[in-house]
Design a protein with these regions (language model features):
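Vicinal oxygen chelate
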Residues: 2, 5-15, 44-47, 65-142
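A short, sequence-level motif marking secondary-structure junctions
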Residues: 57-62, 136
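Short secondary-structure capping/turn micro-motifs that flank functional sites
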Residues: 39-40, 62, 107-108
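Core segments of cupin and vicinal oxygen chelate
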Residues: 4, 11-59
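Active-site/binding-pocket entry motifs
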Residues: 52-53, 61, 97, 104
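Short histidine-centered beta-strand/loop micro-motifs
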Residues: 33-35, 64-69, 110-112
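N-terminal beta-strand motif that seeds the catalytic metal site of vicinal oxygen chelate
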Residues: 1-18, 26, 74-76, 132-142
Length: 142
């Protein structure tokens, strides 16, 4: 299959500063933050592995977007490399409240057959965030 991954998703925010603080506390790298602060670009992004989350700050409306692209509309699952306990510790140290989990889930690896556990939280815009921890970390392609 020629489509092999996700390059980026877009996420609107009601408060860019609050969102930046939240994701930086979790250890994410921010792309174009300085250029955004200087007014050279209209958006910044959160790096996630080889993919990114394009953040649309308050007041910015993308010309191409989903019909319900408003703060809080995003539901995203991150893959965490480590144990459930390490993920819980990372979230707790960042001041993030776990709202559910750990519980078994079927992720995309192994065409939904790889055993995994997930933890759930929300960011400052109330987006649903999931951290999936694969038990065997398989890398088989479909």
């Amino acid at each position: 299959m020629p489509t092999v991954g996700i390059d980026h998703i877009a996420m609107p925010t009601a408060n860019a500063e609050r969102l930046l603080t939240f994701y930086k506390r979790l250890g994410f790298l921010i792309n174009n933050e300085d250029a955004w602060r200087q007014g050279k670009v209209t958006t910044f992004s959160i790096q996630v592995g080889e993919s990114k989350i394009n953040v649309h700050p308050e007041g910015y409306t993308a010309s191409l977007r989903g019909p319900t692209a408003v703060p809080g509309c995003t539901d995203i699952c991150f893959v965490f490399e480590g144990t459930v306990e390490e993920c819980q510790k990372m979230l707790q140290e960042a001041g993030v409240t776990i709202i559910r989990g750990p519980e078994p889930r079927a992720g995309g690896r192994g065409r939904c057959t790889a055993p995994s556990l997930s933890l759930y939280a929300r960011d400052p815009d109330d987006n649903l965030l999931e951290w999936m921890i694969y038990q065997d970390m398989p890398t088989a392609k479909p």
